[in-house]
C-alpha cells in the first residue's frame, strides 16, 4: 500500500525481494515522469521506495487511480541536487534525495537505487556511501549503444577522462560480470577501442591495456582484441572498453548522428506527394525505427564504482511516446543467450547491493 515512511523507520520486507529506491526528485523533467515510472513498476509487481518531497509525491500519486493499493512507500527527502549544481554538494547535503537513496541501499532496506538526476552527484553519493568493490580502483559509466543484433556495451562513457591501463582491464571484468548476470550473456567478448585492429596500434595506454587484457583472456574475460569505432555498431564484440573522454565523445556522436538520420528520413518522406503516401504505408515500421534510434531512449547508466552494482540511472525521455512492443533481435553468434533490450543504455557497475544482482 502507498504509505509515508522515513529512513529511520523503514524496514526490509519480511518476505520476497527488497524494494527499489527511486530518487523521485532527480532529472530534467521533474517528479511527474518519475512517479509515473514508479506506478508502472509497482503495477508490475516491483516494490518501490519513492524518495523525495513528501507533500509533492503524495499529490502526484493521487493522480493515479488505485495508487494507494500499490507497493509504494514515500520516503521524505525534500532536498534535491539540481542538474546545474556541483556534484561535491553531496558531501554537505546529507538529506538530499540521492543520498537518502544510497543510504537505503547501504542499510539493506533497498536492493538498488535509481536516479534520473545529476550523474556526478549520483556517482559521488554512491562512492561516499557504498564504497568500491575490492580490486576496482575507479568507477566507470557503462552505456548500451544500439548495434546490429541488439546493443554493444561501452565503458567508460564519461566518468574518467584520464585512465590507467589497469582501469580498462578492471572495467572489462566488471562489464563481463554485468552482462552474464543481468543480460544472460554466456560468454561476452571484450574489445579494446583503438585506431586499428593490430595489437601495436594505438596510444601507449592502449598498447599497455592490450597486453593486460590479453593476459586475462580465459581468466574471467574473453578478449577479442582491438576494435575500431565502426565495430561498436557492428556488434563485433559484446563489450568495448575505452577511457571516459573517448567514450563520451562516441556516445554523444552516436546521439547526434541518430538525430540527423531521423531528420533525413523525415525530410525524404515529406519531399513530395508520392513520398508522403509511401510514408503512410510504412508509418508503423518507421515509428518502431525511430523508437530504436531515439537518443533519449538509448542511455541507461550504471555507476560502475567498484562497490557493487547498486545504482541505475536510466535516461529520461524528452517527450512522451506511445509504448511499442519491441521486436526480438537476432541472437549474436558469440552469445548463446543474449537479450536485446532495445537501444542504448548507460550505467554503472561496481556498487554494493543489498541483494545479489540476480535477485532483482
Swiss-Prot record:
Gene Ontology cellular-component terms listed: cytoplasm
Principal EC category: transferase
Gene3D superfamilies xrefs: Isopropylmalate Dehydrogenase (3.40.718.10)
Compositionally biased residues, Low complexity: 334-350
GO molecular function annotation: phosphate:acyl-[acyl carrier protein] acyltransferase activity
SUPFAM superfamilies listed in its UniProt record: Isocitrate/Isopropylmalate dehydrogenase-like
Keyword Plastid found: no
GO process annotations (BP): fatty acid biosynthetic process; phospholipid biosynthetic process
Keyword entries, A-Z: Cytoplasm, Lipid biosynthesis, Lipid metabolism, Phospholipid biosynthesis, Phospholipid metabolism, Transferase
Name assigned to this protein: Phosphate acyltransferase
Organism expressing this protein natively: Deinococcus radiodurans (strain ATCC 13939 / DSM 20539 / JCM 16871 / CCUG 27074 / LMG 4051 / NBRC 15346 / NCIMB 9279 / VKM B-1422 / R1)
